[in-house]
């Protein structure tokens, strides 16, 4: 159970609770055991109003407490504790961590294979059938769940969570407070090949990938995402970067601090992406280009050259009836001949 007092403390790591001085001792001691939407929440749950579209549900909510802006706080029921904040959605994000289920397993599982030269910090959890290579360093309070592989000479920071089936290649550096979800591949071989005179006969000459992957602090990487090691220089993921599931980051890519990347995006080699960029789902970005800070790319955008001015960019056409699309496609081909 989480008290209102604990919620306030958590919220105020990001923003103030504007009416906390008005809450009495009984309200501050109120205990909650979960989070629900305005319509379904019960007296032991917290809810929030982040979108005015749901304002009609506020007056009838049975939530024990609600996160709300000053503009709407008078519309909450009298028996519901209103916590007034500038951003209810951010407050919800902050307190959600208090209600998350914590893993019950700790310590090192007897089936884990750990090299004698590995340096394991304090309060580290290593799950079943993990393999930890030579000269690996794992920071305090980090948790590796089952079947994680960490190759030689890799360093993992403090307070990291690494989910099952993650593979981290040799010589990589993972920062502090990093979350790698199931099936992530860090530091696999980049897609580097030189063509021979006739690849159909003599094939392609493999280029050894000699760089590393460097991941900053407070990074989250979703399931089945692949981040390849650099060919010569390193592949670099900055601080506070969040990457969704099924994203491909090729060798020598650099991603700036605070950038968010949605699922199915592919970033080709040696491209540099700035800080605070927002990249929608299924975006394709060609190699050897630069994207400046504060760029937003809407879903399925295809980027073929550098972007030097901050702003929002899109490409492609939205869904329409097939007959209309065929007419539009004809006109598009005609424009190309003009």
UniProtKB/Swiss-Prot annotation:
The record's Pfam families line, in alphabetical order, gives: Hexapep (PF00132), LpxD (PF04613)
Q: Name one GO molecular function term.
A: N-acyltransferase activity
Record's GO cellular component, any one?
membrane
UniProt KW keywords: Acyltransferase, Lipid A biosynthesis, Lipid biosynthesis, Lipid metabolism, Repeat, Transferase
Reaction catalysed by this chain?
a UDP-3-O-[(3R)-3-hydroxyacyl]-alpha-D-glucosamine + a (3R)-hydroxyacyl-[ACP] = a UDP-2-N,3-O-bis[(3R)-3-hydroxyacyl]-alpha-D-glucosamine + holo-[ACP] + H(+)
CDD domains named in the record: LbH_LpxD
Q: GO biological process annotations for this chain's record?
A: lipid A biosynthetic process
Pathway this chain belongs to: Bacterial outer membrane biogenesis; LPS lipid A biosynthesis
Q: Which InterPro entries does its entry note?
A: Hexapep (IPR001451), Hexapep_transf_CS (IPR018357), LpxD (IPR007691), Trimer_LpxA-like_sf (IPR011004), UDP_GlcNAc_AcTrfase_non-rep (IPR020573)
**Which residues of this protein are catalytic?**
251
Chaperone in keyword set: no
| EC number, UniProt record | 2.3.1.191
**Cited function:** Catalyzes the N-acylation of UDP-3-O-acylglucosamine using 3-hydroxyacyl-ACP as the acyl donor. Is involved in the biosynthesis of lipid A, a phosphorylated glycolipid that anchors the lipopolysaccharide to the outer membrane of the cell.
Q: Which family does it belong to?
A: Belongs to the transferase hexapeptide repeat family. LpxD subfamily.
Complex formation: Homotrimer.
Q: What is this protein called?
A: UDP-3-O-acylglucosamine N-acyltransferase
Query: Organism, per UniProt?
Result: Psychrobacter arcticus (strain DSM 17307 / VKM B-2377 / 273-4)
């Amino acid at each position: 159970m989480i008290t209102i007092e604990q919620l306030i403390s958590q919220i105020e790591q990001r923003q103030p609770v504007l009416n906390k001085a008005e809450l009495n001792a009984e309200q501050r001691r109120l205990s909650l055991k979960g989070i629900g939407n305005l319509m379904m929440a019960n007296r032991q749950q917290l809810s929030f109003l982040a979108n005015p579209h749901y304002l009609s549900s506020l007056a009838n909510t049975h939530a024990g407490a609600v996160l709300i802006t000053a503009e709407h706080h008078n519309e909450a029921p009298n028996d519901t504790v209103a916590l007034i904040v500038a951003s209810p959605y951010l407050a919800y994000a902050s307190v959600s961590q208090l209600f998350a289920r914590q893993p019950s397993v700790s310590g090192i599982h007897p089936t884990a294979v750990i090299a004698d030269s590995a340096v394991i910090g304090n309060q580290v959890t290593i799950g079943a059938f993990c393999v930890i290579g030579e000269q690996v360093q794992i920071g305090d309070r980090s948790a590796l769940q089952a079947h994680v592989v960490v190759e030689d000479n890799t360093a993992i920071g403090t307070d990291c969570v690494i989910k099952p089936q993650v593979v981290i290649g040799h010589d990589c550096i993972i920062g502090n407070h990093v979350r790698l979800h199931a099936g992530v591949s860090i530091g696999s071989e980049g897609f580097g090949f030189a063509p021979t005179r006739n690849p159909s006969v003599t094939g392609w000459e493999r280029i050894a990938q000699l760089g590393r992957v460097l991941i900053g602090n407070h990074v989250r990487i979703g399931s089945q995402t692949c981040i390849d090691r650099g060919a010569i220089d390193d592949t670099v993921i900055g601080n506070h970067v969040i990457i969704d599931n099924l994203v491909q980051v090729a060798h020598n890519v650099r991603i700036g601090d605070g950038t968010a990347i949605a699922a199915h995006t592919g970033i080709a080699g040696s491209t540099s992406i700035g800080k605070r960029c927002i990249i929608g789902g299924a975006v394709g970005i060609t190699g050897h280009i630069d994207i400046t800070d504060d760029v937003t790319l809407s879903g399925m955008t295809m980027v073929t050259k550098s972007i030097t001015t901050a702003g929002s960019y899109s490409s492609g056409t939205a869904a329409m009836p097939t007959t209309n699309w065929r007419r539009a496609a004809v006109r598009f081909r005609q424009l190309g001949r003009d």
